[in-house]
Amino acid sequence: MEFVNLRFFVLICFSWLSFIPIANAKYLLIENENIWHELLQISVASKISEKCTSIEARKIKGLFALLQIKSVAKELGYTDNEINEFVSSEENKKKLKNETDIYLLDNGVDLNNVKIICLFGHSEMDQETTIGSLLRIK
């Protein structure tokens, strides 16, 4: 089954992360900076691949990155139920989308200029960043 776009796939997989606090006073997963940063990287790569026709997402690599995030959450003591509830949070989805746009804007990307988005994506690949590693030239 081929996914139409990685962003939709990311949002589906995003449900693996929990928003519900645990009785033993663990932080919400959304407050875990490392997990949130990794999700943001995947989301930025996804948005670049959606907007730039010369770049595509490395979907399998993105899936493995999401599975790694889930593994980290489990190591932190979050249950499958807690992790699975995170995707269903529309608030978290909106926050990720907004922070993706903010990240791109903060890096000089005009979200209405496809050429600039593509240049940023190519730059990320050239610099071998995490975002760049989730992308490839078509």
PLM feature segments, named:
Residues 26-57, 61:
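Immediate post-signal-peptide N-terminus of mature secreted/exported proteins
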Residues 61-138:
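Compact alpha-helical subdomains of small soluble proteins
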Residues 20-25:
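Sec/Tat signal peptide C-region and signal peptidase I cleavage site
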